[in-house]
Structures are given as structure tokens and as C-alpha cells.
């Protein structure tokens, strides 16, 4: 199955503590999860590694969120949208289901 959500897509969170927040997808994992910029921030307690010169402490980083809990954001409608696939000039492209507009890659 082709990936409906891709890197650099603007998405909106549908459920959870960050519901309603928008962000850009930084990484798509093979497990069906994505990492979104500024969303699902967790605090990780980092041990110091003197050999590498790394300092210890509490580091805030983005954790993965399931792809079913996000939707692509349509700027034209200002809402979350669904994605479809179609062929244009022999190429498979993604489009917004609500208005049929092609999604630029």
C-alpha cells in the first residue's frame, strides 16, 4: 500500500493530548507511526557519556504518534482531510478527497 502521509506533509492531530495541533512530519516509521515536529513531546532522562563529551540531564524530544491519529491538513479548506490516489499524465499522484486538489510533493 502506498504511503498516504509522507515526510514534510502538514498534518493535524485528531486525538490525544495534542489534539488540534498542527505540525510538519519529520519522519515516517515502518511501524505505521510518524514523528511530527513539536507534537507528542516527552522528557527523556539522558545519562552522561564522557567518552563522547555528552552531558547528562533531562532532554525534551518528539515521540512517535500512530498514523491513524493524524490527518493531512488542507490549507484551502482549513480542516483535516483524507487522501486519495489517481493517475495524472501517467504518474500516480495524491489528492485531497474534499476538493479534488492535487497535493504537491
Curated annotation (Swiss-Prot):
InterPro entries: KOW, Rib_uL2_dom2, Ribosomal_uL24, Ribosomal_uL24_CS, Ribosomal_uL24_KOW, Translation_prot_SH3-like_sf. It comes from the Bacteria. One of its GO terms (molecular function) is structural constituent of ribosome. Pfam families: KOW, ribosomal_L24. GO terms for cellular component: ribonucleoprotein complex; ribosome. GO terms for biological process: translation. Keywords: Ribonucleoprotein, Ribosomal protein, RNA-binding, rRNA-binding. Coiled coil: none annotated. Part of the 50S ribosomal subunit. HAMAP family: Ribosomal_uL24_B (MF_01326_B). NCBIfam families: rplX_bact. Belongs to the universal ribosomal protein uL24 family. One of two assembly initiator proteins, it binds directly to the 5'-end of the 23S rRNA, where it nucleates assembly of the 50S subunit. This is Large ribosomal subunit protein uL24. It comes from Aliivibrio salmonicida (strain LFI1238).
Amino acid at each position: 500500500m502506498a504511503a498516504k502521509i509522507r515526510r514534510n506533509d502538514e498534518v493535524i492531530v485528531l486525538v490525544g493530548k495534542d489534539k488540534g495541533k498542527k505540525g510538519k512530519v519529520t519522519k515516517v516509521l515502518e511501524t505505521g507511526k510518524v514523528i511530527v515536529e513539536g507534537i507528542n513531546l516527552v522528557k527523556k532522562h539522558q545519562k552522561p557519556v564522557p567518552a563522547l563529551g555528552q552531558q547528562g540531564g533531562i532532554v525534551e524530544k518528539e515521540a512517535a504518534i500512530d498514523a491513524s491519529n493524524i490527518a493531512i491538513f488542507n490549507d484551502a479548506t482549513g480542516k483535516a482531510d483524507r487522501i486519495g490516489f489517481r493517475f495524472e499524465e501517467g504518474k500516480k499522484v495524491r489528492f485531497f478527497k474534499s476538493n479534488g486538489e492535487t497535493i504537491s510533493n
